[in-house]
A protein has these predicted regions:
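A glycine/proline-hinged amphipathic helix-loop "lid/cap" segment
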Residues: 1-41, 46
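Short amphipathic alpha-helix adjacent to the substrate-entry channel of hydrolases
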Residues: 50, 69-90, 105-108
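Short strand-loop-helix active-site module centered on a catalytic nucleophile
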Residues: 33, 57, 79, 90-91, ...
Length: 135
């Protein structure tokens, strides 16, 4: 409903510079994620671009029941540009459709994947940022 402007909350602004990816999760579930990279980095040409200084995993707010990985594009793009870091927002599963602890498991699985694979991808060390649930 929020994406259609049918709630008191305005529809999110989705920026064209974000890249949608999925990360593996336990079982057969794939975690939808969205990332912003500093303008000095392009994954397609890693050899000639400047590697990110690190990676921020963004855990969006919403009390495990609202919002998604595309809800804060403007803020995440700002973080990427100001810090020189890659910023990945995790689209964890939401209650009540997917009751607790499914959302928490998605966040844990995304973090584990980024810790185990981020350096190999040239993304640097992992830190966490977020609002409400992500604090």
């Amino acid at each position: 409903m929020r994406w259609n402007g049918e709630t008191a909350l305005p529809a999110p602004i989705v920026l064209p510079g974000g890249t949608n990816i999925t990360l593996p999760s336990r079982g057969s579930h794939e975690i939808p994620c969205r990332y912003f990279a500093p303008k000095t980095y392009t994954p397609e040409s890693q050899a000639t671009s400047i590697a990110p200084k690190g990676t921020f995993m963004h855990i969006h707010g919403g009390g495990w029941v609202l919002f998604d990985e595309k809800s804060t594009d403007t803020l995440l793009n700002f973080y990427a540009e100001q810090t020189g870091c890659l910023v990945i927002s995790v689209g964890y599963r939401l209650a009540p459709e997917d009751p607790w602890p499914k959302g928490v498991e998605d966040v844990e699985d995304a973090a584990q994947y980024l810790v185990e694979n981020g350096r190999d991808k040239g993304w640097g060390d992992l830190s966490y940022i977020g609002g409400e649930v992500g604090d």
